[in-house]
């Protein structure tokens, strides 16, 4: 399974602690899936790239959106696990442009996912979703990283 973390907008050549932390979590995902950060200039670039990612199965786009559905870590893991078990090859988690996703992009998404009611800086949102992706894989693998709250 290939799970890139995409974002709209360029950070240029600068790196910061949030980029490093995002990369750390994506690297931790390596035993479970191929994960990396991917930047796109605009939404059209993301959808064009997604169109080229078709394989045996259609690429699945998950857009982080404040109007999306908020789910628990366990529910997110179950969603990822279901896609994995169905043989989905590509799940793209995408943090949108500064002014939010266009209505067209929102319609094309397989899932609109909210990280909660608070607004987050995009770099921080990337860290949070990268950590949640790693957590999801560890939940599915029965790894002790996630202890949960019952």
Give short role names for the model-derived ranges.
Residues 1, 33, 58-59, 108-110:
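Short glycine-/polar-rich loops that comprise or flank the Walker A/P-loop
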Residues 1-29:
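N-terminal beta1-alpha1 ligand-phosphate binding loop
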Residues 18-22, 76-79, 107-110, 127-128:
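Short, glycine/charged-enriched secondary-structure capping and boundary segments
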Residues 28-92:
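S-adenosyl-L-methionine/SAH cofactor-binding core of RNA-modifying enzymes
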Residues 103-149:
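Structured adenosyl-cofactor binding patch, chiefly the S-adenosyl-L-methionine
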């Amino acid at each position: 399974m290939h799970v890139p973390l995409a974002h709209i907008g360029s950070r240029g050549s600068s790196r910061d602690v949030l980029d490093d932390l995002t990369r750390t979590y994506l690297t931790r995902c390596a035993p479970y899936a191929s994960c990396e950060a991917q930047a796109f200039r605009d939404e059209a670039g993301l959808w064009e790239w997604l169109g080229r990612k078709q394989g045996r199965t259609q690429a699945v786009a998950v857009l982080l959106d404040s109007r999306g559905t908020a789910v628990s870590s366990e529910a997110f893991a179950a969603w990822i696990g279901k896609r994995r078990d169905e043989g989905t090859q590509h799940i793209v988690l995408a943090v949108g442009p500064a002014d939010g996703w266009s209505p067209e992009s929102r319609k094309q998404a397989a899932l609109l996912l909210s990280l909660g009611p608070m607004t987050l800086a995009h770099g921080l949102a990337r860290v949070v979703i990268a950590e949640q992706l790693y957590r999801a894989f560890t939940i599915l693998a029965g790894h002790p990283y996630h202890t949960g709250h019952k």
